[in-house]
């Protein structure tokens, strides 16, 4: 497997990424590595204004990657809101579709000024696009323009 890492990737992060592609890795090792990677990302997230950051996640990433990111923001006292989506991703006539079957939008999510979309595996843009478009359709643009 070929991957390209930035100069900012630490040895610990490289080790965690290696765990994720290791054949036969235990569930607990995978969970711990994914949570640490989320924490690493949350640790370098730039501090913004007093507005909460909106964390957007699929349900399968919420347990580990997103949790690690949330833990880092909590430790840094950066406010956040959470949006989690459940999708039914499938192919129909050669096209990829991913309708939303359930969603959780934490109260006040629409007042966030920045969005972090956390996704561990992006095999295509279908799920990401569907979830992001659903959020954008619900944003109160008039509120954002006033503030």
Language-model region placement:
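PRPP-associated nucleotide enzymes
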Residues: 1-147
